[in-house]
Amino acid sequence: MQTKFNYVKPSECNIDYHNLINYAKRLENQDIPMHSLIIMRGNNICMESYYKPYDNNSLHRMFSMTKSLVSLGIGCLYGEHKLSLDDHIVDYFKDKLPQNGAYDYMKMLTIRDMLTMRTCHDSTTYKTAGITDWVGSFFTVKPVHAPGTQFSYDTSSTH
């Protein structure tokens, strides 16, 4: 499936051109190493710029993209009122819970906790030897603290 994007003036996206220019200048003034900047609304591209030595054909290695994409998807579902950030994550993954039921801390874990990396684990769960089900490991590895109380960079929470 390929989506066609339209190139339009920022005003056609209800965006002030001067705000886009000021934003781009602010990034540059703060020495943020930009490769590209694309501003879209719907299927419309309102601004597209590239920073030397990069151009629209430059390839990039991508790391930790799952977190961004999952967060975007959750935001869309939240905007459509299909879920709440305070929903308990175990309600969405009943088939991944241990046979004897979820741990108490796991039952308390919310989508909000997951998005903010304040889960009940203090490390990535699927890196334990012998684990092949990354999603399942999140629910079967014993939690170490109450959710929402500690930040821990945890890749398994987004998988």
Task: Tell me what each language-model feature is.
Residues 43, 61-86, 114:
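Active-site SXXK
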Residues 19-55:
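A short, well-structured edge-of-sheet supersecondary motif
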